[in-house]
Amino acid sequence: MALLISGTACHIREVKLSRKPEELIAASPKATVPVIVRPDGDVIEESIEIMRWSLERNDPEGWLEREDRALIEANDGPFKHHLDRYKYPERHASDPLAHRAAGSALLGTLEARLAAQDNLCGDRRGITDAAIFPFVRQFAEVDRGWFDAQPLPRLQAWLRGHLASILFVTAMVRLDPWRPGDAPLEFPAA
């Protein structure tokens, strides 16, 4: 979403993580997604760093002015830890309900923030919203009925708004997994 807001064009490759292409491993030995290889050859391997890099180049909506690093770190650390164990308990030999309860604590923090404003750092969306929203989306999708039944009306409305946004719909292009020899795909599509 930050790439779209910043007007940063790139070639996009969909990767099936169970069959990581050698090109991904060569660019980023960590071989996780997303990865961006900048025009100068430098590699950025973290979503938030890709967002910051693109917005530092061009930030027409002032997203970087609405950044709460502590909230993003809480999301990327403790919340993601609990999300992974709630969503994939078989991978972690964990109790999904215990991790759902722990993850819900951050949801309450987000709900409280949204009581006073439309987005997490003000009335307009910013980098904090874009960084956290995909994780809230994943958390909600594990058990949509449970999530929708929680007393989180502002968070639920915030999530619905981001899911319905043209920005999100444009960002979530569905692609076939990339294979060596495939023609480059421009993002955003021309």
Name each region found by the language model.
Residues 1-105, 111, 115-118:
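GST-like domain detector, emphasizing the conserved glutathione-binding G-site
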Residues 7-9, 58, 139-147:
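Short helix-capping/linker segments at secondary-structure and domain boundaries
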Residues 61-70, 169-179:
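Short, flexible loop/turn segments with low-complexity composition
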Residues 93-99, 118-121, 145-150, 163:
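Residues lining hydrophobic/aromatic ligand-binding pockets adjacent to catalytic sites
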Residues 112-123, 167-171:
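Surface-exposed helix-capping loop/turn segments at secondary-structure junctions
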Residues 120-145, 162:
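GST superfamily/GST-like fold recognition
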Residues 175-190:
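Acidic/histidine-enriched, glycine/proline-rich intrinsically disordered or flexible terminal extensions
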